[in-house]
């Protein structure tokens, strides 16, 4: 949610900021703005809408060798020009951009700024007015630090001072921010992807640290004034990794990348003997626990449900799955030695991070599954396993979901082998995941079939239902989430046996009902449920795996191992959502109101 780019150097910052903000569009936003500092003149341009709208408003001759940019996802105040960032202090001396939520901003207004008039409804404007207030008696750095010391909540901040054209200031707490190093310039960004074109060398900023940046270098300090030395690291990404190439949308590109991601996971976790294995310290840690708690949000939560099924079957350890935003405020009854697995694509999800902090305070051990090495949850967990999915730019997650399930399968089989589980010992997971990758390739080559189904069933529908049983139910929930995210159809996934306990009342003539069937043991049970809604006027569609497919099924899913069926059955569901969104003329990669990386609670 939201994104920050800052630049200080010798070149014009305008293009660097606008291009950087474009690279951060995936994070979700409703308005955007930049500030350019040329000597002692600061030009601010901001507006509700897309980066393209902002770029059209920036004067062609706008110039500044120092600048800050921001994409905003509204938390305080409506999405409009006044609430868009950057914000300026009353005199115009200070200009600021901010990600996060300041929980005590109304109290700070009352205590320090009672006589100030405010242009916006944001918490951010309070910060910049405080800095100006304190700067009447303190240096900019000390005024900044004093303001930061009063803030309760999360923030990533970038600040420029009209009276000091040679310096950029930044700070963070519970919201991602990093420094990019260059020759005769330095950059600040929420995500390395924003500035990969400028540099591939980065330094992390940790919580409650500030950084004073010039074109020649930077100084890291704690709020107490202690200087910090921290090594830089090279980004593993290349600028080409985050381009669409010949694809019309990132989402379609990322759906197509899933076979390659699956094979990359095989390689990453395969030992010299060709066996799939997980670090022994992780295995021992998990097997010494008496209960596993998986904590995740959204798509990652759905992957966690599949993970529960796999781990309980293989490792014989009870597993509970929790929604992050609920877990932190309603801790379950704890066993004697629980272990917590956090699943997060970005590694920055605020709700999940809050849960991780809480369980670590209680002394429990933690494991993070993330796609971003070096992210907050990666750094703060006791152990990490990586997804190897590469950058996922589209807001709706596709390849990260299948990567999460693949890595959970790797973990489950490794645990099962360690305890001598017969099924785990007998499965050649590398080979079976290879079969999954081949099945994925076959399905992404059948796009025209799914496009036709999407047009027939969903182009004009107001709602849709997905049905499944057992492991197919978990995929039905994910399929419904994908559809509602990008096509704005009210879609829900249900355990098909629960239809007659209430949901069937919503079925009327023409209601689209899509059923997923991959398990022989429950094939006819689900088909019976499909007949129940068909008898009440529903327009039904069945996606079935080869071993259970019947004449009349609309799409046949290639056969894969029974434990890995979600990896295959979700592919046509992702494509269905994609083409439904196209038929409805929706913004596939940047759906309204949504953010890729949810960094506020």
Swiss-Prot record:
Subcellular location: Cytoplasm
Name this polypeptide is given: Glutamine--fructose-6-phosphate aminotransferase [isomerizing]
Catalysed reaction equations from the record: D-fructose 6-phosphate + L-glutamine = D-glucosamine 6-phosphate + L-glutamate
Major localization listed first in the record, in broad terms: cytoplasm
Keywords: Aminotransferase, Cytoplasm, Glutamine amidotransferase, Repeat, Transferase
GO BP term, example: carbohydrate metabolic process
Residues forming the catalytic site: 2 (nucleophile), 596 (for fru-6p isomerization activity)
A Pfam family per the record: GATase_6
Catalytic activity, EC: 2.6.1.16
Its job: Catalyzes the first step in hexosamine metabolism, converting fructose-6P into glucosamine-6P using glutamine as a nitrogen source.
Superkingdom in the source lineage: Bacteria
Record-annotated SIS domain positions: 282-421, 453-591
Keyword Cell inner membrane: no
PANTHER family per the UniProt record, alphabetical: GLUCOSAMINE--FRUCTOSE-6-PHOSPHATE AMINOTRANSFERASE, ISOMERIZING, GLUTAMINE--FRUCTOSE-6-PHOSPHATE TRANSAMINASE (ISOMERIZING)
Catalytic class of the enzyme: transferase
InterPro entries according to UniProt: GATase_2_dom, GFAT, GFAT_N, GlmS/AgaS_SIS, GlmS/FrlB_SIS, Ntn_hydrolases_N, SIS_dom, SIS_dom_sf
Domain Glutamine amidotransferase type-2: 2-216
GO cellular component, one term: cytosol
GO MF annotations, alphabetized: carbohydrate derivative binding; glutamine-fructose-6-phosphate transaminase (isomerizing) activity
Subunit structure: Homodimer.
